[in-house]
C-alpha cells in the first residue's frame, strides 16, 4: 500500500490527458513495475512482495484509484492472474510441470518482462459457458472466439482467459495463458466508453491461434461451477470494489474542497446546498 500511495499524485497528473484521448498511459504501468506493484503476489523467493492478503490487495487498488481509476482497475486484472499463478506454484509438487510453468511466469513478472491482461467476458453468454473454443489438432490446440472488456490489453505481453475445451470425457472450462503476439490474436480497438476510458478495455479476437498441447489447464465442467472457477471469480471481483472506493473517496474530497471555496450568497447568507 505504501508503494501505491507514492503514485497517487503522479497518476492524477496524467489522468486527464489519458481520459481525453481515450488511451491507456504506459508510464503508469512502468511505474508500477518499477516499484514492485505488478509483482505483489510473486513469492519473495522469486523476487516479489509475497502478498497473500486480499484485504491489502483491495486497499492497494483503492489507493491507486485515488490517482487514476482506470489504471487501478487494469492492474487489478494482472494481479488476479498472478495471484492464481502464485497459488498454483505453492500447491504444486516442486519439479512438476504446473509448478515449473508457474515459477517461470512469476519470475518473468518479477523481472518486469510480463504484464498479463485477464478476461472471461463474451457477448451472448456468461462466465460458465464460454463460447471461445480450443479445438484439438496435431500441433496442440486451435483457439477461436472473441473476448470483450480485455482490460489493459494494449500494453499486455500476455492474455489469460477461460475457454471451452472438449475431449473424450466431455466439455470443460479451461484456462490458457498465451503471448499477445501469438499469430491470430487481433486487438479490435473498440473501447470508447464514458468511463474508465484509459483502461484499454477493448475486445480481442482469437483467429485460429495455435497454442501448445500443455497450455490448457482444465478448471471445471463447461456450464457448471467448480471450486477453481468460484475462487477465481470471487477473488477477481472483490478487489474491484477497492477501485470504486478510491474513486468515491476522491470525488468526495474534491466536492468538499470545492464547497469550501464556493461562496454563493443571497441576502447576506450562504445559499443552502445540502447535497454538499
Q: At which residue positions do the language-model features occur?
A:
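Alpha-helical interface subdomain recognition
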Residues: 1-45, 49-59, 241-276
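Glycine-rich flavin
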Residues: 26, 33, 40-147, 151
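Short loop segments at secondary-structure junctions
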Residues: 89-90, 137-138, 164-168, 180-183, ...
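A generic structural signal for beta-strand entry/edge sites
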Residues: 138-142, 158, 201
Amino acid at each position: 500500500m505504501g508503494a501505491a500511495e507514492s503514485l497517487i499524485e503522479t497518476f492524477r497528473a496524467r489522468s486527464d490527458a489519458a481520459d481525453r484521448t481515450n488511451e491507456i498511459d504506459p508510464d503508469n504501468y512502468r511505474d508500477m513495475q518499477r516499484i514492485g506493484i505488478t509483482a505483489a503476489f510473486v513469492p519473495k523467493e522469486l523476487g516479489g512482495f509475497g502478498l497473500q492478503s486480499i484485504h491489502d490487495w483491495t486497499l492497494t487498488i483503492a489507493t491507486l484509484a485515488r490517482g487514476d481509476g482506470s489504471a487501478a482497475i487494469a492492474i487489478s486484472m494482472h494481479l488476479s492472474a498472478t495471484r492464481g499463478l502464485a497459488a498454483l506454484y505453492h500447491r504444486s509438487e516442486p519439479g512438476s510441470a504446473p509448478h515449473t510453468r508457474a515459477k517461470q511466469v512469476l519470475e518473468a513478472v518479477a523481472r518486469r518482462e510480463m504484464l498479463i491482461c485477464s478476461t472471461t467476458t463474451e457477448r451472448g453468454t456468461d462466465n460458465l459457458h464460454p463460447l471461445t473454443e480450443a479445438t484439438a489438432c496435431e500441433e496442440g490446440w486451435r483457439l477461436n472466439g472473441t473476448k470483450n472488456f480485455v482490460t489493459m490489453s494494449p500494453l499486455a505481453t500476455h492474455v489469460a482467459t477461460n475457454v471451452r475445451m472438449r475431449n473424450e470425457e466431455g466439455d470443460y472450462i479451461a484456462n490458457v495463458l498465451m503471448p499477445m503476439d501469438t499469430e491470430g490474436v487481433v486487438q479490435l480497438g473498440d473501447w470508447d466508453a464514458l468511463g474508465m476510458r484509459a483502461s484499454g478495455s477493448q475486445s480481442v479476437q482469437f483467429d485460429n491461434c495455435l497454442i501448445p498441447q500443455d497450455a490448457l489447464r482444465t478448471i471445471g465442467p463447461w456450464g457448471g461451477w467448480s471450486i477453481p472457477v468460484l475462487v477465481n471469480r470471487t477473488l477477481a471481483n472483490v478487489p474491484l470494489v477497492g477501485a470504486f472506493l478510491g474513486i468515491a473517496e476522491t470525488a468526495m474530497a474534491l466536492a468538499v474542497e470545492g464547497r469550501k471555496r464556493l461562496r454563493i450568497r443571497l441576502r447576506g447568507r450562504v445559499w443552502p446546498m445540502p447535497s454538499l
